[in-house]
Amino acid sequence: MKLWELALAIGGAICLLLGTAWIRRSELPRKDFVLDAGICRVPVTEYDPPASVSPAGSAIVLHGLSANRRVMTYLSEDFAGHGLRTYALDLPGHGDNREPFTFPRAQLCATATVETLIRSGTIDPRTTVLVGHSMGAAIAIRMADREPVLATIAISPAPMKLPMRMPANLLVFTAQFDIPPLAKEAKNLEAAAGGARNAPEDFAQLRAFDLERIPFASHTSLLLDRRVAHRSELWAMRALFPDVATETLALNVDLATYETFNFGRRRLAGAVLGLIGLVLVFPLAASAVVQLFAQIFRTAKNQASSAPAADLQNDPQINSSNRMPGRALILVEGIVSALIGVVVLILFVPLKFLHLYSGDYLASLLLIYGALMLILNRSAARATFSLNIATKVAAAALSVGTILAVGAWLNWQLTDGWLNAPRWLRFCALVPVLWVFAYAEEVVLGPVDSGWRRLIRFVFALALRLELWLVCVFAYYELMSGQVLILLLVTALAVFSILQRLGTDALRRRTGSAPAAAFFGAILGAWLIASVFPLT
């Protein structure tokens, strides 16, 4: 344990406490339940306005592909904080919904849920707003043919067959960095609606339309964008109160009780601050876990404390005959291996039995890529391999603790980080697959150095990941792979890759074991794929 690790851990604990306080201060009444809607069982979270605020209407929030109702927490609580009782749904195959996902089934269950809420008198379609993102936005728009409501807000809608009639009071958002098919869909909706109409009489006659282009935003960042939340709430208020001046409604949205007195804007900041706190605590946790299991195994084997110490401090030395090729050659090997992988996946997907929408494709690609990279660098792979049990157990304990801690925090405010039973089964199947990929990465990256060499190694690791993603982009546009979800998740995959590499390097530096570091990275990667991609 080092002084800087202790200092970071103290800072992390402060971040966690402060983040928790901010979230608690701004929390609204909420309850979770499962709604029986015909043949669908849909998990729902209901967010109520502050106790002193009488609901002006209702909002139904629909998430996008590979998301869940917790991803929509920021928008859901913001709508509730401004006087709309809000219902966020988990569509089939997403979040807590264990039913298999297909696009038609997602639309069927979303529509059935709205119909059930209307029939039960829970919501009134004359004061209800549909809010959707990506796939959820497309479903909300197409719902106009079955369940017309007061207004619809479509955030970066997915490509769709347009409904027979346009939804009433439709607001569409598109991001500056949206992928071309999504940007094109927004323009198609604008053309179908006949351009912008946002006068008070347009809202009164249920024909208002506007297209908002958000600069410096991506497909996923729109969900956490204050501009999107503010303009969405103002649009909903204009639909609910068309006779009230827009300036008055805007002032009401800006100075709403929830924002002014309950620090609603700190909600998201608190969630992010908590994640930063967990990152700061990690170095101390890694050192403590490695030292603990090293001591346990020394005691169990009745050995001198210095005997296994070398295995916990230094990577095995690779002699000149087994030396790795240069980084430029490794990048070429990576591109070739990834291209071979996407070509093979045109013929068949080896891990199709996992039944994870796009997740089985990604896992299969990583398996093929990892196997080819190990074959190309087999001498270094043999020289790097070790069977020290203490390091593997330490890696397993640290990785499981990490996904439980991070998953619990994410599950509270940001996304569904807890795995249900079907996802745990897929997680177990993914770990050995991801170990092949992770070990190939550790082999080609080599031992963790210090100073500038460590930074260069880190950038090189991210370059290898970027290569893989760019090959997936190539496969989507040129080979018609259909795996658009991997493109849409670029932000999440980038953030995960950075944090996973930092954690894996920290463990490898403390254990000196490439296989143990790969085991740690594999467990984190398996958790990501099992938790994010929809069940089919």
Regions found by a protein language model. Give the residues of each.
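An N-terminal hydrophobic leader/cap segment in hydrolases
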Residues: K2-D36, P43
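Soluble extramembrane regions of membrane proteins in the secretory/endomembrane system
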Residues: E27-N262
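Cytosolic-side membrane-insertion boundary helix
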Residues: T246-A304, I318-I330
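Alpha-helical transmembrane segments of multi-pass membrane proteins
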Residues: L17-A21, P283-S287, V342-L345
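Intrinsically disordered, low-complexity terminal tails and inter-domain linkers enriched
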Residues: S52, A300-M324, L524-A530
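Alpha-helical transmembrane segments
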Residues: W4-G11, A269-V279, F427-C428, V490, ...
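Alpha-helical transmembrane segments of integral membrane proteins
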Residues: A310, N314, A328-T536
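N-terminal membrane topogenic signal
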Residues: M1-A7, P325-V332
